[in-house]
Amino acid sequence: RNYIVENVSQSGEVPATGYVPSGVYDAEGANGDDFRTVGGEYYSVSADDYQANCDKARELLAEAGYPNGEGFPAVEYMYNTDDRHKAIAEALQNMWQTELGVTVNLSNQDWNVFLKSRKDGDFQIARNGWIADYNDPCSFLDMWYTGGGNNDAQYSNPEYDALIDAAKATSDQTE
C-alpha cells in the first residue's frame, strides 16, 4: 500500500489501514478523536511488515494447496476506464504475480458497465475509489452490511450486522 501511494498514485494519499480511513470522526463526532486513532489499525502498512505480510500470504496459499501459487486459478481484477485505476491495477497485478505466483488478468470497463457489473456481483475483484457520504464510520462500515446499498461484494454476516445495529443504537462509546 505504501508503494502504491508513493510510487503509483503519488497524490499524497494515506495508505489504508482499515475499512474506515483516517479523518473520520469517532463516536463523539467533531468533538472527539479520529476513528482510526481510537479504533487502531487493522492492517500494518509499514515497509518493515511488507515482507512478513507476503510470507504469510504465501503460507496461507500453501496451506490451501497452492504452494507458490501453483494451480491457483487465474484471478480477474476489474477496474473502470481511468488511467489512475489502470496504474494501480497493473501494480497489484505485478505484486501478486511476483510475490505470490498468482496470475491476475486485468479487465477494464467503461464507467456505466463497471457500475452494473459491480451491482450485479459480476466480478471477482473490483477496484473502487469512494469517499464517505457523511463523516461517520458507518458510512464505510455499511459497505459490508447485508443488503446495504453500497455492498457490491454482496457480503453477508449476521454477527457483523448485529454489531453494526448495536453500534447505531447506542451513544455510549464504551459499548
Task: Label the predicted regions.
Residues 8-11, 18-23, 71-75:
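Short coil/turn segments at secondary-structure boundaries
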Residues 5-10, 18-19, 88-91, 137-140:
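Short, solvent-exposed loop/turn and secondary-structure capping segments
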Residues 14-63, 82-86:
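Structural transition elements
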